[in-house]
Regions:
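Hydrophobic faces of well-ordered beta-strands that scaffold small-molecule active sites
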Residues: 35-38, 63-67, 86-90, 114, ...
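Alpha/beta enzyme core
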Residues: 56, 97, 101-263
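Single conserved hydrophobic/aromatic residue that forms the stacking wall/gate
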Residues: 2-8, 12
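Outer-membrane beta-barrel proteins
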Residues: 89-99
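Glycine-rich active-site/cofactor-binding loop and its immediate structural neighborhood
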Residues: 31-70
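N-terminal amphipathic alpha-helix/helix-capping segment at the start of soluble metabolic enzymes
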Residues: 14-35, 196-198
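Acidic (Asp/Glu)-rich catalytic clusters
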Residues: 75-83, 226
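Short, charged beta->alpha transition segments
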Residues: 11, 20-27, 66-78
Length: 263
């Protein structure tokens, strides 16, 4: 009917779509698309180039690359490799000198922004890992040996390239951070479960640049993040892996955006 016709007409605005401009600005850097690479630990598990490959890809497509504290390459390696926009994902450590060192190295290496993860103070009960048999350090089982046999290229690259380690913190523990040391062990040994708002504010001030709080799930926390000087927030993307009884992060977007989206 006539009402439906007018309503449908409103849907299809007469906008030029010949060459759409997808660019936007984040942390003072213009990027070519409203998408960037989120930090991901241990990227060499799926490709021998690890973070190097991700940084190159982000640079190629004109967007942010984000580095995890638990990356397999160093801050300096990535800085020398890519001139594109870069973000570092930080955790508050029990030993504050480790936290300070990571912040200082990022500043010297020209990183554009920093985010502090606040929803992984302890390791989650990763049920999928139990089902698939994934462990660090790896356990040689019939299933894993079969998987290695089915992926000879991965095995070959693992054998000929440098050994796995958490490159940015490899010298910070007596036991080291090679593949023989569980990532979960490092989290439990080094991450500070007593982290609070004062710790977050300390990191914001020490970085003294574009800073995001990563892992926010409530309007109250979003407002508090702005109050302590954060320039952005990241709604939790860990979801049920960390706390399976929580709401979906997607369901929190509108309320948080309405509360602090213009700040």
């Amino acid at each position: 009917d006539d009402c439906s016709s007018r309503g449908l007409g409103d849907v299809y605005k007469r906008q030029s779509v010949g060459k759409p401009d997808l660019s936007t600005t984040i942390f003072g850097r213009k990027i070519d698309m409203p998408i960037f690479l989120s930090p991901c630990a241990m990227q060499r598990l799926y490709h021998h180039d690890g973070d190097k490959a991700s940084a190159k890809a982000a640079n190629k497509f004109g967007t942010f690359y984000s580095m995890s504290t638990m990356a397999n390459n160093t801050i300096e390696e990535i800085s020398n490799l890519s001139s594109g926009p870069k973000l570092f994902q930080l955790y508050v450590h029990k030993d504050q000198s480790i936290t300070n060192d990571l912040i200082d190295r990022c500043r010297r290496s020209g990183f554009d922004g920093m985010c502090l993860t606040v929803d992984t103070l302890v390791a989650g009960n990763r049920e999928r890992d139990y089902r698939t048999g994934f462990t660090t350090p790896p356990k040689l089982t019939l299933k894993s040996l079969l998987s290695f046999a089915m992926h000879p290229t991965w095995v070959f690259n693992y054998l000929i390239h440098e050994k796995f380690k958490l490159a940015n913190v490899a010298t910070k523990t007596d036991k080291g951070t090679n593949i023989a040391k569980s990532v979960i062990d490092y989290i439990n040994e080094q991450y500070d479960p007593a982290m609070n708002w004062k710790d977050a504010e300390y990191c914001v001030k020490k970085w003294n640049g574009p800073f995001a709080l990563k892992g926010v799930m409530s309007v109250e926390d979003a407002k508090k993040a702005i109050d302590i000087g954060c320039s952005a927030i990241m709604i939790s993307n860990h979801g049920g892996r960390q706390l399976d009884g929580s709401r979906s992060p997607f369901d929190q977007i509108k309320a948080i955006s309405d509360a602090v989206g213009d700040k």
